[in-house]
Amino acid sequence: RLGRYAKPFGLYKLRSMSRKYSGQNAIQIFTRMNRPDLVEEYRKHRKVRKDPRITAFGKFLRLTSLDELPQLINVLKGDMSLVGPRPILPDELEFYRGRGSLLHSVKPGMTGLWQVSGRNDLPFEKRVELELYYAQNWSFWLDVKILLKTIPAVFRKGSAH
């Protein structure tokens, strides 16, 4: 993942996806599965609601957001903050249309404006918009507001997948 100043770092996370799909291109996997519906959903959201690559235990981890807890190690190491834009993969940088330097002007966070504004129910373009808004308008009080909204967002049914 890319951190502040686009510096790559290792993101700690509990494995929720079957190992056989690790590091493979999602669109190619869904195409091989003959699932054009998943290809379309992935192109729109960069995620899929009922992802067949996720294990049964992984579904539980994602629904409860427990897969994200190891990122506290990233926070303690200084790679991440509690609040900020989600750390992106290098191939996602193209979606920020030349505004990657703005995105990477702040540390990535465990939670952020995207998570408390609808999370996976929003198209990826909206995520980009929210992440850039945060980077441009960061303030202590915005972080407090996001932190206060995070707990109900985690428990909101269906927002994590």
Regions found by a protein language model. Give the residues of each.
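Conserved small/aromatic sequence motifs within transmembrane helices
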Residues: R1-H161
